């Protein structure tokens, strides 16, 4: 026999409702829980701390081009396997599995269209495809984007989001650093602006090549930008690094970045800057 007897009925709760996956996202910076719709409306930036989430190229296209309308080109280029490279799996298998899993075909997408009524060519990298690494296809597509800009007599914007060179392609990957830099020189010869937008992360061979060669180097807030990662540097020199080292704000303070632009202001600032750069004196 129980010593205590409940006189009043217990609190009744309704059955728990299943919450669809992907409805909420946690901010990596401040930890705030954000509803997907709220995040989309805020261009995938945290309304509390302004942390910029990584976004895919097509979202940049939607943001930058008028009415989100653009024409993509060079979509069918695919990576080869010149070294017959194998780590935990064969390189072609890794590429195939990434395509199957992500629905993406490479770590960069090219498009052209109108930005505030003016022609613009955009080459946008995607960290979601093998860390946004630059292999022979990525280098070729960025080079072709420069060619298309010359053909259209239009500015070129390259959006960097990469961990660096694609080591599975060895020297073929490293060659793309020189290849892209050389092709961008042609833009300068034609007096066409090249704008580099660095997002989180812009590292390794990307920062050591085209990402730092812009007529204007722009960054999103708090983007990680550098060659080797901060942990590698710290372990090598055996010293603590300055606070904020390799973040966009640190680079702006030391003259490596020209401006930091919030994603909400990107299209307007870009259009105004390009209009000034194209004025004939």
UniProtKB/Swiss-Prot annotation:
Keywords: ATP-binding, Cytoplasm, Fatty acid biosynthesis, Fatty acid metabolism, Lipid biosynthesis, Lipid metabolism, Metal-binding, Nucleotide-binding, Transferase, Zinc, Zinc-finger
Cofactor requirements of the protein: Zn(2+)
Assembly behavior: Acetyl-CoA carboxylase is a heterohexamer composed of biotin carboxyl carrier protein (AccB), biotin carboxylase (AccC) and two subunits each of ACCase subunit alpha (AccA) and ACCase subunit beta (AccD).
Binding site residues for Zn(2+): 27, 30, 46, 49
Protein name, entry field: Acetyl-coenzyme A carboxylase carboxyl transferase subunit beta
Transmembrane region(s): none
Ranges of residues in domain CoA carboxyltransferase N-terminal: 23-281
GO molecular function: acetyl-CoA carboxylase activity; ATP binding; carboxyl- or carbamoyltransferase activity; zinc ion binding
GO cellular component term of the entry, any: acetyl-CoA carboxylase complex
Superkingdom field: Bacteria
Cross-referenced Pfam families: Carboxyl_trans, Zn_ribbon_ACC
């Amino acid at each position: 026999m129980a010593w205590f007897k409940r006189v009043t009925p217990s609190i009744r709760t309704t059955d728990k409702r299943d919450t669809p996956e992907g409805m909420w996202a946690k901010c990596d910076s401040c930890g705030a829980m954000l509803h997907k719709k709220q995040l989309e409306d805020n261009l995938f930036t945290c309304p509390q701390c302004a942390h910029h989430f990584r976004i895919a190229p097509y979202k940049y296209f939607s943001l930058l081009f008028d009415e989100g309308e653009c024409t993509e080109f060079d979509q069918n280029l695919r990576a080869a396997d010149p070294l017959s490279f194998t780590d935990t799996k064969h390189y072609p298998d890794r590429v195939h599995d990434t395509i199957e899993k992500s629905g993406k075909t490479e770590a960069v997408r090219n498009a052209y269209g109108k930005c505030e009524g003016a022609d613009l060519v955009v080459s946008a990298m995607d960290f979601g495809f093998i860390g946004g690494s630059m292999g022979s296809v990525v280098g070729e597509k960025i080079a072709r984007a420069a060619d298309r800009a010359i053909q259209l007599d239009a500015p070129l914007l390259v959006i960097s989001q990469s961990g660096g060179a694609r080591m599975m392609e060895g020297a073929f990957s490293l060659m793309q650093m020189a290849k892209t830099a050389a092709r961008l020189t042609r833009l300068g010869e034609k007096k066409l602006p090249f704008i580099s937008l660095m997002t989180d992360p812009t590292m390794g061979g990307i920062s050591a090549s085209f990402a730092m060669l812009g007529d204007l180097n722009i960054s999103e807030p708090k983007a990680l930008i550098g060659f080797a990662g901060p942990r590698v540097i710290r372990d090598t020199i055996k010293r603590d690094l300055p606070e904020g080292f390799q973040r966009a704000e640190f680079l702006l303070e030391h003259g490596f970045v020209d401006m930091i632009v919030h994603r909400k202001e990107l299209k307007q600032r870009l259009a105004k800057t390009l209009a000034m750069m194209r004025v004939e004196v």
